[in-house]
Structure formats: structure tokens, C-alpha cells
């Protein structure tokens, strides 16, 4: 664990960036990650049963998930790649704290609203974001930190639909997004508790 990681507060959840150097450089990265998130046929998590909710930010998401992916790829076609690092997708996972996950599991009507707000943060207002909330009930050898905990996968298009420039994702950006997500979760959970609605 790095010194930077030691200073992060995980009490309200943690953000894990899966886009390491050389990862997601394949042209089919976007549909593969989407398939994994949804447990689609042919994916490594085919027929997963722990998907609670999914959607997209910055793309039409009420018709078909394949249409979402087409929209991602259309934006990418407009970007001219100047370097050897041809990253086609960013994949990040926010793992809720155990307590927050329990509250959200007991109040599923809030999951849609919270996950959309979280995707808005991850998008920075210019990067299309597909997301899927998992209950954490299924064992996942690829992401052991998510086992037994509610979590949300973010598939972020690394090309801006506003500027067509690449997303700069590094430790500082991950830390910034993590803090924003933690603050959002704290606010939303506190409001839920104060409303007298949490079960």
C-alpha cells in the first residue's frame, strides 16, 4: 500500500481505479466491460444475479444498452489518437461501506437516484459514464474487495463528448472523485436517516 493510499479515509466507501497502464487498450474494451457489469452472455460473469440497477450519464440509456455503447464508440471515432496509449475505456469501482450498503439494500428506491448522481460526478460533466450497481452477493475473484459489499461499477468513456480530448486519470483524479463520492454518500445517507424512512 502506498503512502498516498494510507492517508485516504475509507469510512464512507472507496474508489478503485482498474485502468492500469496497458489495460483496456483493446478496441472491444467498452462492450466487454459493459457485458461484465451486466453479466451478459459470453462475459466472464455470465448470468450474474447481483445487478440491482444500471444506467448511463451523458448517453441515452432508456432504449437499449447496446445503443449506449454505440454512443460511446461514436464519440471515440471523432478523437484522433496521437499517442501509443490507446485506452478505450476507464473502469472504476466504488465500494460502499458495509453500513451504507445495508441501508441502501433496505431502501432500494434510493439506489437509482444516488447512482445517477455518482455517475454525474464520475463524468466530470463531459465524459459518458455507464454504471451498474451490484449487491455484492456474488463472489468475484477479479475484485475481491467488492465481495460481500454493495458496489457500483463505472465504465467511463475516456474521450470527452464536449472537447474530444482524452480524460486524464491519475491518482489525484481518483482521490478527488473518491472524496466527492464519499461526500455525496454521506449527504444522501444522512438525509435518508433524517427523513425517518430508512428501514
List each language-model region with its residue ranges:
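N-terminal nicking endonuclease/strand-transfer module with a His-rich metal-binding environment
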Residues: 1-199
